[in-house]
Amino acid sequence: MTIALGKFTKEEKDLFDIMDDWLRRDRFVFVGWSGLLLFPCAYFALGGWFTGTTFVTSWYTHGLASSYLEGCNFLTAAVSTPANSLAHSLLLLWGPEAQGDFTRWCQLGGLWTFVALHGAFGLIGFMLRQFELARSVQLRPYNAIAFSAPIAVFVSVFLIYPLGQSGWFFAPSFGVAAIFRFILFFQGFHNWTLNPFHMMGVAGVLGAALLCAIHGATVENTLFEDGDGANTFRAFNPTQAEETYSMVTANRFWSQIFGVAFSNKRWLHFFMLFVPVTGLWMSALGVVGLALNLRAYDFVSQEIRAAEDPEFETFYTKNILLNEGIRAWMAAQDQPHENLIFPEEVLPRGNAL
């Protein structure tokens, strides 16, 4: 047997170890390596949006007022996209367009690219934060996987779609009314509601809402009597070892209602994860298709018959005519640089004009 005598000396920590110890320390607000991406990007994205909606006009890019300073409110203010003439420029503050002039940069729409890019990386940082924390406490990464769905939608709508078009101009501006207008644009120019990917997205989101309502109600209905409190919350013991509700009772109830029911909690909760996430992923794929100007369903036979027979009309042909009206009205409004002129008789009429 060999005995080694001497003093054990631990190697000094290098810079990575020191940073790792500090970043992943147990504190009230976890930072982590993901925080190096999340916190600066979220700060700049939110700060840029608040700055733009408060002070910055869209007169030079869209011919619109879009800030609180100009009289907008929370629903009508927005950080607007750059002009179409700027195409896909990153609009860096020090770039050839603004040349370091902050006022000019804001007027050209630089805040939009600033908010969009920092927002995208901020969302990715938040997903990585969920990965990092899950790994630290030895959880599976399904929270992060689920959060990839809204990230996919954001990236496809705000970045990939305008990249497939002529410029950032055709992306949504960051504002409530601006997003509504973008939805109308999507319908008029892409017939988005008849796109199968949009249909899958609607089924996913509304189906998830239905599943949440059913699940929450079923759990409340089958709670074990675990206390003498007057309501659910006072009777709840956060350290209880037993189940909170009866899966067996819930299974029997829904078996009688529908004839089928979830047999175990794992499959039930996976299904609640699968439905909305898949729906949002499909929506994102559909928007990528729109970036390439792929068309939705076309029922040409109905259009031809409606054109030939004044007595034949379907909800589809009526919607196609509505889309033509949207295009005729929005194209001249939204793209003044194209100098589009439509005869008065093809434009929509109404006292709102």
UniProtKB/Swiss-Prot annotation:
InterPro entries: D1/D2 (IPR055266), Photo_II_D1/D2_sf (IPR036854), Photo_RC_L/M (IPR000484), Photo_RC_L/M_CS (IPR055265), PSII_PsbD/D2 (IPR005868). Keywords: Acetylation, Chlorophyll, Chloroplast, Chromophore, Electron transport, Iron, Magnesium, Membrane, Metal-binding, Oxidoreductase, Phosphoprotein, Photosynthesis, Photosystem II, Plastid, Thylakoid, Transmembrane, Transmembrane helix, Transport. It is found in: Plastid, Chloroplast thylakoid membrane. It is a multi-pass membrane protein. The modification Phosphothreonine is found at residue 2. GO terms for cellular component: chloroplast thylakoid membrane; photosystem II. Chlorophyll a PD2 binds at residue 198. Pheophytin a binds at residues 130, 143. The modification N-acetylthreonine is found at residue 2. Chlorophyll a ChlzD2 binds at residue 118. Fe cation binds at residues 215, 269. The chain crosses the membrane at residues 41-61, 125-141, 153-166, 208-228, 279-295. A plastoquinone binds at residues 215, 262. The D1/D2 heterodimer binds P680, chlorophylls that are the primary electron donor of PSII, and subsequent electron acceptors. It shares a non-heme iron and each subunit binds pheophytin, quinone, additional chlorophylls, carotenoids and lipids. There is also a Cl(-1) ion associated with D1 and D2, which is required for oxygen evolution. The PSII complex binds additional chlorophylls, carotenoids and specific lipids. GO terms for biological process: photosynthetic electron transport in photosystem II. It catalyses: 2 a plastoquinone + 4 hnu + 2 H2O = 2 a plastoquinol + O2. Pfam families: Photo_RC (PF00124). Belongs to the reaction center PufL/M/PsbA/D family. 2 of the reaction center chlorophylls (ChlD1 and ChlD2) are entirely coordinated by water. PSII is composed of 1 copy each of membrane proteins PsbA, PsbB, PsbC, PsbD, PsbE, PsbF, PsbH, PsbI, PsbJ, PsbK, PsbL, PsbM, PsbT, PsbX, PsbY, PsbZ, Psb30/Ycf12, at least 3 peripheral proteins of the oxygen-evolving complex and a large number of cofactors. It forms dimeric complexes. PANTHER family: PHOTOSYSTEM II D2 PROTEIN (PTHR33149:SF57), PHOTOSYSTEM II PROTEIN D1 (PTHR33149). Photosystem II (PSII) is a light-driven water:plastoquinone oxidoreductase that uses light energy to abstract electrons from H(2)O, generating O(2) and a proton gradient subsequently used for ATP formation. It consists of a core antenna complex that captures photons, and an electron transfer chain that converts photonic excitation into a charge separation. The D1/D2 (PsbA/PsbD) reaction center heterodimer binds P680, the primary electron donor of PSII as well as several subsequent electron acceptors. D2 is needed for assembly of a stable PSII complex. This is Photosystem II D2 protein. It comes from Citrus sinensis.
